[in-house]
């Protein structure tokens, strides 16, 4: 594999698709040599203008207006799928059947049954990478907290208090889109709560059960847009209104196999919090707190600091922490990083998997996405049963 180049494509030219396109563009510039030449071949989107602009902006050779063109292309080996969730299964299965390595955005599918089918399709192509993108695993700060758990810096997890607060849906005049369709559980829970669930297990181990779930919708209908919309952008509205089919807020309690607990809340109507993921992890020997709005630091308290200097302190993230050494043009303390860089780290890790390198932690397989979907399903069941405990 390393004797030949890799052709890369991205399906979806929206907000997340652009992040994947940019990630591949920079992937060969981090962590030294090792990858074969990477060709940025195509960006595909039904909206030709979006596809063309994204391809031009990030240096891809061409744009396409159908995912089928990507699947049929002989010069493409690796594909990111960054489109509406209901399309993930059809596109990913077709790409695997066409011999492409696939990195699919989360949530893996719109239902557990669809996710199971995707895992089965991946099993039929064992020589191909079929992965799901839980990008926050690539955060140097979050990965550092995981290391602190594993090395007993903060001890064994006792309780995780996590949140993901966004306001992309806070405006009732925001246009209707696929994000507001699909039934209960496909809204804030699937869109951003899936990240929280994955991070909970990333830091605390497997979830054994969920309870106390609440799923709430506070904006019950929206107007259809008068034109095309990218990501969470505003647009002119038509006179046609449709009901919102899924939840704006998701809240749950998770119980881990280790005995640890978590309270997790996700909201897409948190006015003033554009993109705020955070947590406080309480361990047997200390505590670590993170907020995506200040991604280059952690708040830490641990039992190794006693007496008059004990207490909460700020730890700046730098070369001593995961991903940064070799992963940034200026990889020394105080430079900082952001969420866009996580897509670069993820793209590099995925390309390494494709060619069989073992440098970075692997991008999780479809099976991890299915597992996450099953936990989401348990949350929906708990909410439907007035917060009853649902075992996994």
Enumerate the predicted regions with their spans.
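C-terminal glycine/acidic-rich active-site capping loop/insertion
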Residues: 219-247, 251, 255-258, 285-363, ...
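Conserved acidic residues
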Residues: 41, 61, 75-77
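Glycine-rich phosphate/pyrophosphate-binding beta-alpha loops
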Residues: 194, 265-274, 338
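Predominantly a Rossmann-like dinucleotide-binding segment in NAD(P)-dependent oxidoreductases
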Residues: 16, 128, 136-244, 298, ...
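Beta-strand-loop-alpha-helix segment that lines the small-molecule cofactor/substrate pocket
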Residues: 78, 84-137, 152
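Conserved SAM-binding strand-loop segment of SAM-dependent methyltransferases
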Residues: 61-67
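N-terminal Rossmann-like dinucleotide-binding module
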Residues: 1-58
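Alpha-helix termini
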Residues: 27-35, 125, 152, 356-358
